[in-house]
Amino acid sequence: MELRAIKTGKLIIFGRECDMEKKTALIIGASRGLGFALVQEYLARGWQVVATVREKSGSALHELAERSSGDLEVERLDITDTNQMLILKRRLQNRRFDLLFVNAGVANDRYETIGEVATEEFIRVMVTNALSPMRVVENFELNVVANGTIGVMSSGQGSVADNEKGGFEVYRASKAALNTLMRSFAARHSQDKRSLLLIAPGWVKTEMGGPDARYSIEESIPRVVDTITAQANTSGLQYLDQFGKVVRW
């Protein structure tokens, strides 16, 4: 068998050009908005991606997979469903990824105070934004290679130090809880050489961010991916914005 590398990053096998091994990403929560854009950006940069949505079929991600020439695989996962998470964990148990990135976020009314929010709504936001992303990290961290990256989509509103204007009280609390849980994970894995990231993408024009947000998805997500890429092979936990600047805890 003829097998040789050439400068273009290709292999010649039986006279055919083949891509050398691509980097791989597992992106959780990619049905729309920031998560979907992350998948698009990594595909555009030549990665192979496994991404999750809640739907069995018919989503924009499924349609993207059909056009991806095999570089995108779609798996089903409701991030709050522990049974689905365990099923996916078994399905992917022998897979290894350079990047695990978890994107999840819901919000209640921005002006609803902690004294007004219903208990059920408080639980919904906390479970979706804090508990469930960390359950993903706990269940899939062994799928990430030794020099890989584990990232979670946080928010600048998760910063306790920067909370000077109020508003979004429950959402802020949920992202602050996420940050604290990720920090506890990092403390338990202090000898881990992988990069651990909390990413604040900025106020982005999404369904949740609204039309008046400062940044478009097309502005934010390439910067987010640049920031993730720049931190590769940098061990320990960092809380960074889309520009790679440190966010105060």
In which residue ranges do the predicted regions lie?
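Conserved N-terminal Rossmann-fold NAD(P)-binding element of oxidoreductases
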Residues: A25-G29
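N-terminal Rossmann NAD(P)H-binding glycine-rich loop of SDR-like oxidoreductase domains
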Residues: S31, G35-Q40
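Conserved glycine-rich Rossmann-like NAD(P)H-binding loop of the short-chain dehydrogenase/reductase
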Residues: R45-L61
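Rossmann-fold cofactor-recognition segment
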Residues: R67-N83
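Conserved Rossmann-fold cofactor-binding substructure of NAD(P)-dependent oxidoreductases
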Residues: I79-R95
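Catalytic loop of short-chain dehydrogenase/reductase
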Residues: V106, R110-M126, M134, L142, ...
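C-terminal helical subdomain
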Residues: Q191, L198-I199, G210-W249
